[in-house]
């Protein structure tokens, strides 16, 4: 029996239309699922939409439609886009479906039956935007996740004993380090749990748009318990049907939950705790990717900087978008999207490198060998250059697999394109067009070896890249005379398997070069879509909440007015606002040896700060550490990132290495320095 592989996207919240931020997650999952199928795995790929909650209820009321009408429309747009993009999902779950309602209520019953749910009352703040109960002081206090004003809620609730799982969760993270990936997110989650867990309200009585609590229909189940359960309900959990039960037993637990970094807490703290409480196995790995930025800012409807996947597809095709997102963005880190960068990457890697390799290799086989793959020379007649390509190809097969399995898609593709570059150089160095002009038998054999080597390398690149650029590689496969690439299994991928005498298919360009007009067309299409596709719902981003205020950076502080001897007044000093913050995330800035990107909790919000402390501090050593932050500086960009604040540190020694300011006593986050 084939190994099973179950992968999921997050289910997308239907408060706005899909854009390439959603496409990024879905493309990554689709590529992983495709490669698993090529490996022969029994693969199940799930996506869908999250359709309940107070935010949807209010948005529908503001639009003058029912919640069901709103969710039907937006869910249809998500499904339609995935179908247009050729996304190979096996199921599309909607949380308004009866099968999901049945499964969520069964999840609630199991958790309650195991003694982890009790009834109480909640009085405090609630963020409608994030569908999140928050610890905040006073009415309209800002949400620590998104910064928006919270609402005061006082109602009877059911509570989940989240506090009972603190030790079990920490043990999970320690014993299974790959449960949360990348490591920066794992450190962030561990710091959060070590800070102490409070019991979680998991029902509402003041809204109606949701799934009723079993045996107590006045209560609606908390939207995150509802939403997270989709990973189980879609494969049969809670169904009375025996086939559904067998399906759940076969595919669960999930092998990969792919999510955006903004919903790490819900998936890595709440979800495993819910499953432990229900007595169900845990997913094997939760992989959190970074944000996709548009010209250095996070995409959001309120900013008006959303880019729709259809815009790129209409001009450059599916493969261009898929390749750019997985090659350009280092998975797990934030990545930047722009039309200029997209076209540059398309022309460089796809049109020039791979497209050129395919076109000239197949064209020369067509011309010199009547469209049949030639017979290569025996080993004794091969040159070191021939053997080097064969060796590089075998090494690439191995390195690609290792990098891909570690979710390093960009580096895996870089390895594959190194082979493309090596073969293009091999063709230039060996000049098959010149060899073809020689009439002797030895030259004919040499020409055959050169073109066989190039064609075999092209076959290997096509097989490796197929999960990323499926349309183009399917066409290359057919042009090589190999038929339908979906029948190929990666276990058979090794050098020398291309059979001589194979008749080529019709040879045509795979990636025509794009000019500057492509950029202009995409920009115009985006402007038109922005004005004509205004969604009839309240403005808000599509997936779950953003935990960081929009990326911002550290400028030099405006210098207070000084006297002639350099002293400033107490009033001037009072203008500088310094607060205690706690580092939640720390990671290196690509291409900058001295810079770290930090996410710092200052009590009222989480700030992104770029700090020049990398020479003195390893990123992992900073997570959970308290620092002093100047919080009222104007934002400034460093290395394409914005920093909103400045870390206070001393400059020590001849090299001026930074030493962070700290406290001998414990000081609460958000405390102001005076």
Predicted feature descriptions by range:
Residues 2-74, 93-109, 113, 130, ...:
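N-terminal catalytic cores of NTP/NDP-binding nucleotidyl/phosphoryl-transfer enzymes
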Residues 2-47, 99-103, 146, 152-367, ...:
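Structured secondary-structure scaffolds
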Residues 74-90:
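A glycine-rich helix N-cap at a beta->alpha junction
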Residues 91-102, 120-133, 186-187, 288:
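Short, glycine/charge-rich beta-strand/loop segments that flank catalytic centers
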Residues 114-166, 170:
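Cys/His-rich short segments
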Residues 119, 341-378, 389-503, 510, ...:
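Helix-rich, typically C-terminal accessory recognition domains appended to large enzymatic cores
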Residues 476-572:
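Intrinsic disorder at enzyme termini
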Residues 541-674:
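Phosphate-backbone binding interfaces of nucleic-acid-interacting proteins
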